[in-house]
Structures are given as C-alpha cells and as structure tokens.
Amino acid sequence: MRRSERAVTDPQMIREILDRAKVMHVGFVDQADPYVVPVNFGYTYEDDVLTLYFNSAVTGHKMDIIKENPTVFCTISVQDGLKDGGDNACSFSYYYASVMGKGRALRLTGNEEKRAALDILMKHQTGREGFVYGDSSLSRLAVLKVKLENFTAKMNPKA
C-alpha cells in the first residue's frame, strides 16, 4: 500500500467499514480478460479471517468463470464525499474507506450451508433475521463463499 498512513488495521474499524457498505465488486479472470461484477454481500470477520458471501444464478457467465478459475479479487468501498481543492485541481481528493483482497470463490452445495450464508447476507443487507428459504428456491440459487487469503483496508476520512 503506497499511502501507508491511510492503512486501517484495527478490527473494529474494519468492521465499521464493512457494515456501512452494501455492494462489493468481485473481479474474475475470464481466460486472459478481467470481468468485474457488483453484488450485494454479507460477511463474517473472526480471528482476523474475513469471509464474504454473495449469491448468483446457478448458470451464467460468473459461474462458468468460477468453474475454470475460482480466484477472485473483491473490493468493498464507502464513499464519503469530495474534498474540495479550490482552484487547484490537484488539491482535490475524495473521502472514502475501503477493504479489498484476494481469495477463492467456493460454491456452497448443501441447503443448510446455503441458508446459513444467506442469513449472514440478509442480516448485513437488511438488519433483519428470520428469513425463510424454500428448498425449491435454494435449488435455483448459487451461494458463494470467499475466504480472503489476504486483505487490506484503508481510509481517507473527513477531518
């Protein structure tokens, strides 16, 4: 990380960034080409291990890529506004916080593990619990888990 003074290492601050964000961009490698998709997500962060969950249709381009190469790169960011630089364009900046890292997308197969992952995702997205997921709905839904092998967090906070 070039701007090491912006690094965030405190687990509670990392959780706060993740809690504020609702969309994650997942980058895939489609043969030699990048392919990036925005998705809603949920997460667990325990003992310095960050695990991300998202869902997808069972078939489609994302799933085809994952079968060939499950390596992904995830970015999560929160935008906090433009820092006005006056008349000097090079003095402008942006207030933000972000978490990003590399991992492998694993497709969950059992309905119970899908339900557990969807509970995490739905609680993150809505703040609510107690959702019902029918077996027929789950059969048409791919649920993916990405344990980040390494990740970084940084922020440029408003003063």
Regions found by a protein language model. Name each.
Residues D19, T59, K67-V72, K123-G127:
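Short, intrinsically disordered, mixed-charge
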Residues I14-L18, V36-L52, K83-Y95:
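Short N-terminal helix-initiation segments at or just after the protein's N-terminus
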Residues H61-D84, F92:
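Helix-adjacent hinge/juxtasegments
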Residues M1-R20:
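Extreme N-terminal tail/first-helix region
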Residues R2-R3, Q79-A159:
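Charged, gly/pro-rich active-site loop segments
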Residues I14, K62, K114-A117:
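Amphipathic alpha-helical interface surfaces
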Residues A21-V58, C74:
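Short beta-strand segments
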Residues V23, V36-P38, T71, Y96, ...:
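Broad gene-expression machinery/nucleic-acid interaction feature
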